[in-house]
């Protein structure tokens, strides 16, 4: 909440002191403009009085500073001296607000001109102004707006935290709600004045309304009972407010506990008279009891009821007849008739609501008045809510027996000792007696069945099982079960529901993907080595991080052309690979050092066609389906151009395992890509039949080496990267994006100490160092 500050409208300190002395000469201490002393109060705390000052002023209508100053100047001259108990609790620029009598308006647009005296800590209830009616004429109330900010001079320089005060004393505003209605001059509506503080919009701001008695009720702080006519919502509101103010309002004297003054009644009584009469009934010792203890005639303690409960206030002489609201509502049913309670039995025949103390009297009344008085052969039940829906009986005795259901008469009582059951029909009693005697006179009539039953209905159910007559069929789709009695059908339906719940649980558990399943799907699976004589070679050769002059004799051969990764950038270390399982079109093997993108001085020759008789299989275009965080596919032709030069082979002959160039003269022109996003580890070729896989390759064919083998670790400038990017993008259609690099030797140094597993494809360096990403290769 924002508090607006006025300009310099405060009078000098001498005027403040003079005004305060004129208002209250008996003040115990002198009032100065800088720091007003706070005399102790025996009845209320300082915080509560501060809240009264601040919240009262914050509810006034906005007006100019001049009008506020003039209004307060007039108020000073009008008030006589008060007792010291009315003295200030807050130092202000214009004196003490609490020196004013309760109920005095503080501005021309004041919306609260009747403050209860107990909130000011008044020990003497016989104040010079016992009623706010004396000062009500100066409160020219208008239709106030919601959340009006205070423009009174007291808001300047006080430094009061309104939020803290309102939270400390949540019911300080509720105490003086109906003030402006204290005289006929102030009957203007005041809706939504305090609603923004109370949390309920306009719930506690009653409008001026006429009451039949002409007298408004009052509230006296005492026990936890409710005045009659307050309504259920009023009781709930009162209990809630009482909990809030349990620690805020101290148990003070009885003299200051009238919260709501009233209009003058028809008999000339005023709220002040009622206050004096009610206070005489409560001694001081009774008020010290907890609120939970019931008092003889205790009106409720706390704030007045909400707005919707005010029109239901009763005359003051009804106060001794207070009773609990729940008791007034109990026993009433929807039709407004009293149920059988306290020995009363009600007749619900149409247009009849007779009450009887004894059940026999009600039965006699139904028979003599409602059945025997019917003319002709009309034996229809007209009981309210009867399920027969006015279907007549064909005999009088049947109607009488039926009426026992409504009246509750059960004349047929069990004669066995200890059994207290009674029945309205004699047949039901006979069936019950068979349960005591064990008699089962109803035998199954189906040949060969010896079952017997105590009643005919059970026998009929059993006989339907023999006749295969099962009228009670299951209505669930897909179920063809039928039953002879409805009870069995109900059990079956319950079993259906339990089975459906179990099925839903199983389906839910099966559809939910476990995190481990997703991890297993994304895991890199090892490639199975091809069955070739080279598999018997030593698997330990070729994995050493140190450089070597040639390929290891035991280089692994895989079933598809792959780019082996050993997680170590080496100068001259070879990763051997076997021939591809199917013919793949490659560029002419006439490439040399000058024909590779490592040397920008020469031009790359175009791709050469494979032999005319050979099947043409173009390398698959990289697609998003082949891209994974650890693998970035690329055409073999591109990688062959980017690799180190190798010896020329005649077309149509198989190439030997790749021999990387280890000449040191080549290294200055080598390219080292920082943080290449995943080494190109595997290439996913299209699936071909096994027959094509066994065909020996024809035409020019070469095995693509590992891409990291051609990335020799060396230093190069930005020009070398530009040349490589241009050559890479021009001939492959793959765009190269440069990103900031975090390391200069990703392949060589960061992963040199990592463990190696010859049976698995190792993930790239990005898997371990994701922050060192420098180049991302995407499709052009």
From Swiss-Prot:
GO terms for biological process: negative regulation of transcription by RNA polymerase II; positive regulation of transcription by RNA polymerase II; transcription by RNA polymerase II. Belongs to the GLI C2H2-type zinc-finger protein family. Residues 80-148, 290-315, 485-512, 527-670 are annotated as: Disordered. The gene is Glis3. Residues 497-512 have a biased composition (Basic and acidic residues). Residues 293-308 have a biased composition (Pro residues). Gene3D superfamilies: Classic Zinc Finger. The keyword Zinc applies. Residues 135-148 have a biased composition (Basic residues). It is found in: Nucleus. A zinc finger (C2H2-type) spans 345-370, 379-406, 412-436, 442-466, 472-496. In the embryo, expressed at high levels in the kidney and testis. In the adult, expressed at high levels in the kidney and uterus and at lower levels in the brain, lung, skeletal muscle and pancreas. Its main location: nucleus. It comes from Mus musculus (Mouse). This is Zinc finger protein GLIS3. It comes from the Eukaryota. GO terms for cellular component: nucleus. Residues 80-92, 106-115, 593-605 have a biased composition (Polar residues).
